[in-house]
Amino acid sequence: MMESGEALLKKLDGRLSGLRGRLTPDTGMDKITWFRAGGPAQVLFQPSDEEDLSAFLKAVPEEIPLLVVGIGSNLLVRDGGVPGFVVRLSAKGFGEVEQVCDTQLRAGAAAPDKRVAAAALEAGLADFHFYHGIPGGIGGALRMNAGANGVETRERVVEVRALDRKGEVHVLSNADMGYAYRHSSASPDLIFTSVLFEGVPGERDDIRRAMDEVQHHRETVQPVREKTGGSTFKNPEGTSAWKEIDKAGCRGLRVGGAQMSEMHCNFMINTGNATGHDLETLGETVRARVFENSGIRLHWEIKRLGLFREGEQIEEFLGKII
């Protein structure tokens, strides 16, 4: 069991006094994540801007755990909470999107993906329409190479601005990001703060039509009005996660208040009172049943984090990787 956030702040008394952002002890992560489940952050920090974040990183000893989150769309937080600091990049300090030249946009890491799609439409830049259908923020899109409709984040990235654990600035090229399918090999210790995108000129009517198609498709096949974290598992090579989940009889499967959506069975939803334990147990049950049915091991796309409640544990399904 972790100590209180107040106790942690007391240990750092004076070191954080110059910060302009907001420090909040013992804040429920269920207020932040789209699943609306999970235990508290020991201390939540919302920096005002990159300079404030840098000052915070320089002040906090490296042995204290630190987790950075964006808008909380693909996070499953365990019920025992998250020790140390959870840093949430705010829309005010990190959510702007601006056109910097004819073919380039700069976006803060907390900008919703949809905002980037809208800015690209206004600028007449094509091939950002896929962001219109991704329920997340740009920081997460950079970290996991988010994509849809045959387009991926890596195709648009010029450079990414980031801070390391010591608060020092780094600028990473597209190659530095080490992109692969739903993955970046950039150091997990780097905190992305903004990105420079490159687009190609397009007709606004065509871009708007593509965005409308993305939105229509999403509303037709995904549970967009439910409490969900988006796609639960990555697509295995040569097939789709939802197909394997469906073939294993897991469409609509429930554990407590957690359910695999009837509409799209690779989406896990909180039907009202799910705990983090319910959600993770459901996910591991699905992985086991899919492996038993098809020999395919599904890999989580949703990020799981935090501590189990005292006395709780989930044995991760360890199927053979093929």
Swiss-Prot record:
Q: Which organism is it from?
A: Brucella canis (strain ATCC 23365 / NCTC 10854 / RM-666)
What are the subcellular locations of this protein?
A: Cytoplasm
Q: What Gene3D superfamilies is this protein classified in?
A: 3.30.465.10, UDP-N-acetylenolpyruvoylglucosamine reductase, C-terminal domain (3.90.78.10), Uridine Diphospho-n-acetylenolpyruvylglucosamine Reductase, domain 2 (3.30.43.10)
Q: What does it do? A: Cell wall formation.
What HAMAP family does its record include? MurB
For this chain, one GO molecular function annotation is: UDP-N-acetylmuramate dehydrogenase activity
Q: Which gene encodes it?
A: murB
What cellular component terms from Gene Ontology apply here?
A: cytosol
Q: Which UniProt keywords apply?
A: Cell cycle, Cell division, Cell shape, Cell wall biogenesis/degradation, Cytoplasm, FAD, Flavoprotein, NADP, Oxidoreductase, Peptidoglycan synthesis
The record places domain FAD-binding PCMH-type at 36-202
Pathway(s) the chain acts in: Cell wall biogenesis; peptidoglycan biosynthesis
NCBIfam families under this entry? murB, PRK13905.1
Q: What is this protein called?
A: UDP-N-acetylenolpyruvoylglucosamine reductase
Q: Which domain of life is it from?
A: Bacteria
Family of this protein? Belongs to the MurB family.
- Annotated catalysed reactions: UDP-N-acetyl-alpha-D-muramate + NADP(+) = UDP-N-acetyl-3-O-(1-carboxyvinyl)-alpha-D-glucosamine + NADPH + H(+)
Q: InterPro entries, from UniProt?
A: FAD-bd_PCMH (IPR016166), FAD-bd_PCMH-like_sf (IPR036318), FAD-bd_PCMH_sub1 (IPR016167), FAD-bd_PCMH_sub2 (IPR016169), MurB (IPR003170), MurB_C (IPR011601), MurB_C_sf (IPR036635), Oxid_FAD_bind_N (IPR006094)
Output the PROSITE patterns linked to this UniProt entry: FAD_PCMH
One example of a Gene Ontology biological process annotation: regulation of cell shape
Task: Tell me where it mainly resides.
Answer: cytoplasm
User: Where does the record place the catalytic residues?
Assistant: 182, 231, 301
Q: What is its EC number?
A: 1.3.1.98
**What cofactor(s) does the depicted protein rely on?**
FAD
- SUPFAM superfamilies reported for this sequence: FAD-binding/transporter-associated domain-like, Uridine diphospho-N-Acetylenolpyruvylglucosamine reductase, MurB, C-terminal domain
